[in-house]
A protein has these predicted regions:
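Beta-rich carbohydrate-recognition modules and glycan-binding surfaces
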Residues: 1-179
């Protein structure tokens, strides 16, 4: 497991490749029979390059999510994020609430994650999401930052029109890792 670099994606690489060398992907509830529909795009929004998630989240057929997902290591392995305090995102959206989901190598089932909500306003805003405030969802596992594997920007849990963009996502803090 290698130590996590500060920058996850600053939108400088050729789309849909992130700064960490992996590719953003769109995941929807259709993988489990839902009917939500969405699109991922790379575009310039209010003067900034961004990756954007747009679509209709539907609760039909036990669905209810659209997600921009990104593995944190190109080999699918985990990174060690213990030296960081949390995640910082530059976000833009339609004044709706979204989630950032974390997955670790301890998580096996697709519905398990660690979650933190944020609001995406119609102006570029920087949000700080401290790891200490992420809550486990349908898992008994602790959030082990030395096993961080994947992040997801998620529109979830209610029927609505999703429109959220990320211009920068990185770790913040930078203390020393625990022994």
């Amino acid at each position: 497991v290698r130590e996590a670099a500060e920058v996850i994606d600053d939108l400088r690489a050729e789309p849909p490749v992130a700064a960490v060398g992996t590719r953003w992907s769109l995941v929807s509830d259709r993988v489990m029979g839902g009917v939500s529909s969405g699109a991922m795009s790379r575009e310039r929004i209010a003067g900034r390059d961004a990756i954007r998630l747009q679509g209709a989240v539907s609760l039909e057929n036990n669905g209810g999510f659209l997600q921009l997902a990104l593995d944190l290591a190109s080999d699918g392995e985990a990174v060690d994020a213990r030296r960081w305090t949390g995640l910082r995102l530059d976000v833009f959206g339609n004044d709706q609430d979204y989630n950032l989901h974390l997955r670790t190598s301890d998580i096996r089932r697709p519905w398990e994650s660690f979650r933190h909500a944020f609001r995406a306003t119609p102006d570029w805003t920087t949000v700080l999401l401290p790891f200490a405030e992420f809550t486990p969802h349908r898992t008994d596992q602790p959030l082990r930052l030395e096993r961080l594997r994947r992040i997801g920007v998620v529109a979830i849990g209610r029927a609505f029109e999703a429109d959220v963009a990320i211009a920068d996502i990185r770790f913040y803090g930078g203390g020393r890792p625990e022994a």
